[in-house]
Amino acid sequence: MSELDQLRQEAEQLKSQIREARKSANDTTLATVASNLEPIGRIQMRTRRTLRGHLAKIYAMHWASDSRNLVSASQDGKLIVWDSYTTNKVHAIPLRSSWVMTCAYAPSGSFVACGGLDNICSIYSLKTREGNVRVSRELPGHTGYLSCCRFLDDNQIVTSSGDMTCALWDIETGQQCTAFTGHTGDVMSLSLSPDFRTFISGACDASAKLWDIRDGMCKQTFPGHESDINAVAFFPSGNAFATGSDDATCRLFDIRADQELAMYSHDNIICGITSVAFSKSGRLLFAGYDDFNCNVWDSMRQERAGVLAGHDNRVSCLGVTEDGMAVCTGSWDSFLKIWN
């Protein structure tokens, strides 16, 4: 038996010890605890606004912290900032590369960012003196596509990439401050914790990881999915998070219990999940699917509570406003829809 096989065996034994330790700490299940909760009933939401203007598939969207404006990125090579109340386009930004996969709105509302197959995170300033929008910084350094980016503030942004890493950047200097390494597959998504001290990443190695932004270390790894994780989203309390995967399930993981609490799936749902987001209370989990629908799950009772049907193609992205009053879905049908 080679040394490598011995080490593999040892690693497997350690993994099963961890599984046993998790089991012994698991004194009840979420289903048991949630069984005496009132059912929330059928969630029926209507399309309040349709944002038309993109000419190709929409790949990403992100709400501004004012819960009114949002930014969307499309294969038509445009980044559009919308006013969701009036459906007006506040800015239409032509991109240098049309192969965009992610976009983000800075908490201050002064900047947006995007990136994709160009491997670069581009930062655009919305509040220039001249009134025009321009690239204020380009952040090259990833050796694979940019899959997700989120601002910490106007000078720091976290990115995830197809090069199996995440990174923290100083926007002013354009330098990478921290590299977060440990995934063994493309990192597809990230979600910042409510206190901005940690973030979760989901990757094609079918695991999610919790990272400390300040020291760059991976604090926890969460296995369980059977295929790529495409989307992750923190629970509003910051103590749990949801994942969406190509294995046709969403799952809820508890950070303090260090394990999976719930799985959201249905025999009729056989396609992958592209995006996930929680309602303000965390009771509802919105998930966008390849079959053109957005399912609404009761996160506690693990039941389907509703469906947002209105797109004619894959729902590629979704987001809930900070005030919790609206959901936006973006699709390959080139439209964004606002629901409540």
UniProtKB/Swiss-Prot annotation:
- Note whether DNA-binding occurs among the keywords: no
Protein's GO biological process? cell division; embryo development ending in birth or egg hatching; establishment of mitotic spindle orientation; G protein-coupled receptor signaling pathway; negative regulation of locomotion; regulation of egg-laying behavior
Question: Does this UniProt record's set of keywords contain Cell cycle?
Answer: yes
- Database matches in InterPro entries: G-protein_beta_WD-40_rep, Gprotein_B, Guanine_nucleotide-bd_bsu, WD40/YVTN_repeat-like_dom_sf, WD40_repeat_CS, WD40_repeat_dom_sf, WD40_rpt
PROSITE patterns, alphabetized: WD_REPEATS_1, WD_REPEATS_2, WD_REPEATS_REGION
**Homology family:** Belongs to the WD repeat G protein beta family.
Gene name of this polypeptide: gpb-1
Q: What is this protein called?
A: Guanine nucleotide-binding protein subunit beta-1
- Protein source organism: Caenorhabditis elegans
